[in-house]
A protein has these predicted regions:
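C-terminal halves and exits of single transmembrane alpha-helices
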Residues: 75-98, 115-119
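Loop-to-transmembrane helix junctions at the membrane interface
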Residues: 60-77
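Non-cytosolic membrane-interface motifs at loop->transmembrane helix junctions
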Residues: 33-41, 96-106
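Core segments of alpha-helical transmembrane spans in multipass integral membrane proteins
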Residues: 19, 40-58, 80-83, 111-115
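N-terminal signal-anchor transmembrane alpha-helix
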Residues: 1-33
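Loop-to-helix transition at the N-terminal end of transmembrane alpha-helices
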Residues: 31-52, 68-73
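Membrane-water interface at the C-terminal end of transmembrane alpha helices
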Residues: 111-131
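Short, highly charged, low-complexity non-transmembrane loops/tails of multi-pass membrane proteins
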Residues: 129-141
Length: 141
């Protein structure tokens, strides 16, 4: 991966985290403190939306499939570090969210990061396997 890609993915990851944190600072109470069905709907759809957004970013940046795991980490790390600060200072960064909702919010975050990173790892492993199979076919032939 090019140095420019590394830097741009870190910057994009930071921007996505800032936008998401601002959104949840104002709207998290509507998701986490209203109805169970609203929470579970958001719990199911937000990770999928995040994964789609990240896939679009990697495709538009033309990141080779074999580099998706590291590229996705570059997108995720700013948010993971930022969320550690947010979760440890929940009342400061999420003033509309009750402290008791910190656990569900944390679970929500972990699920999103897990789905996005697992998807990237699967894509990377398949790409590497495909390259190895092609190389073995050429050497056998």
């Amino acid at each position: 991966m090019k140095r420019r890609d590394v830097l741009s993915l870190l910057v994009l990851g930071s921007l996505i985290w800032v936008a998401g944190t601002i959104l949840y600072a104002y709207r998290a109470n509507v998701i986490f403190e209203t109805t169970s069905s609203r929470y579970w709907w958001a719990f199911a759809t937000s990770p999928v939306f995040s994964a789609i957004l990240c896939v679009v970013i990697l495709r538009r940046r033309r990141i080779p499939l074999a580099h998706w795991a590291s590229a996705m980490l570059l997108l995720a790390i700013p948010g993971m570090l930022g969320e550690a600060v947010v979760l440890s200072n929940l009342s400061t960064f999420m003033p509309r969210l009750h402290a008791a909702s910190g656990g569900p919010y944390g679970a929500f975050l972990f699920t999103t990061y897990a789905l996005v990173l697992a998807l990237a790892e699967i894509v990377t492993l398949r790409a590497q396997s495909s390259v190895q199979n092609t190389a073995q076919s050429r050497s056998a032939g």
